[in-house]
């Protein structure tokens, strides 16, 4: 088996007489996905250099040289002039090589004291995820804003509400749109709650047992924007439940968008005819000239399966690892980086799609009473007249059966037909057999009455603004 050169430049080569085989190195190398951590490596290395200095392990001059070298390395990473070589095993080795190239081995070689790749990567990955979820949160707030803006533009439009995908009761279009905003708000709450657990720094935990060099994990944690340092060095280096939790939150965002996407796909069909897609957010067919396809919504629905798969795969990776660190954990980053990348594609696309929808409110209004959606209003009118609901439910169902037999709506039943079902069904019941009356009567908190929906929208917008303010506040000063 061919060898991959020597271990010169590797972070672990002293114990070995030769380098890894080509196949071993190909399996081991991770710079193609962990290079996203390079900017965070610079930040953490600067903080680590300062605690080495505070512990008397770096002179003033060496600290200045090291910080200048790290700053230059950070600039070179940012502008692309420094990157990993084919011989670099991972981001950590590449970045140490870059520092030594800039400050020399005498100073650059001192930085590794008191830290392991185990605590280093756990810290850098947390830093990356904290920034990434804030970017996702901004995208979610923009989608919520698109939903509430459309809701505010159609305050009185009535549509069929459905359960089991069957006609149920009339609701306001604004109520339906805001129903999609609510789970997205909860997703933002999940992001912020996740961040509380992400804000614990593993730095200073070493390989698993901590450090004997009397370094200061709390100082590093504070400089890197963490709320605290980890309480248990074994757990800090070996746990990735923060990653699986992030994978869940990201997948849940996709699932919530997929439900919205599913409705958009249905609504733009001729059978529904509720909406027209903007040309900029739809595609055509290579053979059927008439087609206008909801590709944004379909890709959202399809990519959601990908994010669910990322979550399932990561959980499977974590399920049977003994303490402490195991190389299996190298597999933690790709699923999360991919899920973030997919949401960064989907969120602006779905926001653009929603914000440019044209609603056929006349069509929605026409279909709102179809399927006898006012049957519950008839039954509840009887309840208000003192009839037990069991009897009212039976009477309303009987009215539906008669109307179905005649092929008419409930409001088209004659006074005699209503009274024949139950003498307590007087002509006054007709006051509630309108979709406007049905909507207006649902005036309790959370209901579909116009005033309640407007209040809901105000609360959504207020919460959304608070989440946006959090998401746009930098983790590190």
From Swiss-Prot:
Cellular component annotations (GO), alphabetically ordered: cytosol
UniProt-listed Pfam families: ASL_C2, Lyase_1
Entry-linked Gene3D superfamilies: Fumarase/aspartase (C-terminal domain), Fumarase/aspartase (Central domain), Fumarase/aspartase (N-terminal domain)
GO MF entry, a single one: argininosuccinate lyase activity
GO biological process: arginine biosynthetic process via ornithine; L-arginine biosynthetic process
Compartments it resides in: Cytoplasm
Main location: cytoplasm
rRNA processing as UniProt keyword: no
Superkingdom to which the source organism belongs: Bacteria
CDD domains linked to this entry: Argininosuccinate_lyase
Catalytic reactions on record: 2-(N(omega)-L-arginino)succinate = fumarate + L-arginine
Pathway assigned in UniProt: Amino-acid biosynthesis; L-arginine biosynthesis; L-arginine from L-ornithine and carbamoyl phosphate: step 3/3
Disulfide bonds: none
Keywords: Amino-acid biosynthesis, Arginine biosynthesis, Cytoplasm, Lyase
Family: Belongs to the lyase 1 family. Argininosuccinate lyase subfamily.
Protein name as annotated: Argininosuccinate lyase
Protein source organism: Corynebacterium efficiens (strain DSM 44549 / YS-314 / AJ 12310 / JCM 11189 / NBRC 100395)
Source lineage: Bacteria, Bacillati, Actinomycetota, Actinomycetes, Mycobacteriales
């Amino acid at each position: 088996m061919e060898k991959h050169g020597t271990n010169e430049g590797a972070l672990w080569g002293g114990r070995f007489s030769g380098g890894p085989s080509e196949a071993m190195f190909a399996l081991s190398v991770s710079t193609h996905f962990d290079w996203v951590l390079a900017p965070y490596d610079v930040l953490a290395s600067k903080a680590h250099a300062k605690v080495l200095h505070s512990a008397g392990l770096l002179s003033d001059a060496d600290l200045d040289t090291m910080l200048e070298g790290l700053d230059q390395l950070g600039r070179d990473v940012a502008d692309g002039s420094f990157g990993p070589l084919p011989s670099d095993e991972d981001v950590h080795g590449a970045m140490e090589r870059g520092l030594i190239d800039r400050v020399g081995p005498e100073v650059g070689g001192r930085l590794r004291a008191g830290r392991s790749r185990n605590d280093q990567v756990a810290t850098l990955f947390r830093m990356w995820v904290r920034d990434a979820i804030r970017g996702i949160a901004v995208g979610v707030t923009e989608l919520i804003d698109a939903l509430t803006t459309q809701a505010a533009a159609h305050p009185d439009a009535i549509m069929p509400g459905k359960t089991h995908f069957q006609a149920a009761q009339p609701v306001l279009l604004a109520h339906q749109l805001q129903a999609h905003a609510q789970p997205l708000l909860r997703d933002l709450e999940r992001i912020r709650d996740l961040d509380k657990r992400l804000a614990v720094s593993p730095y200073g935990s070493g390989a698993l047992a901590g450090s004997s060099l009397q370094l200061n994990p709390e100082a590093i944690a504070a400089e890197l924007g963490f709320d605290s340092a980890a309480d248990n060095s074994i757990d800090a280096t070996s746990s990735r439940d923060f990653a699986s939790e992030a994978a869940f939150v990201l997948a849940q965002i996709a699932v919530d968008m997929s439900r919205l996407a599913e409705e958009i796909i249905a609504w733009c069909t001729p059978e529904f005819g509720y909406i027209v897609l903007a040309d900029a957010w739809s595609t055509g067919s290579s053979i059927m000239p008439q087609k206008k396809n909801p590709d944004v919504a379909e890709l959202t629905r399809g990519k959601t399966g990908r994010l669910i798969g990322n979550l399932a795969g990561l959980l499977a990776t974590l399920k049977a690892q003994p303490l402490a660190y195991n190389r299996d954990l190298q597999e933690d980053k790709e699923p999360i980086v991919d899920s973030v990348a997919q949401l960064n594609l989907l969120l602006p696309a779905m926001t653009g799609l929603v914000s440019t929808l044209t609603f056929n409110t006349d069509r929605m209004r026409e279909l709102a009473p179809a399927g006898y959606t006012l049957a519950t209003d008839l039954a509840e009118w009887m309840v208000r007249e003192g009839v037990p609901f069991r009897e009212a439910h039976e009477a309303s169902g009987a009215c539906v059966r008669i109307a179905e037999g005649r092929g008419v709506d409930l409001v088209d039943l004659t006074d005699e037909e209503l009274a024949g079902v139950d003498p307590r069904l007087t002509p006054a019941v007709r006051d509630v057999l309108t979709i406007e009356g049905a909507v207006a009567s649902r005036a309790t908190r959370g209901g579909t009455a116009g005033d309640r929906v407007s209040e809901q929208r105000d609360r959504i917008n207020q919460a959304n603004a608070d989440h946006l303010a959090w998401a746009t506040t930098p983790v590190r000063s």
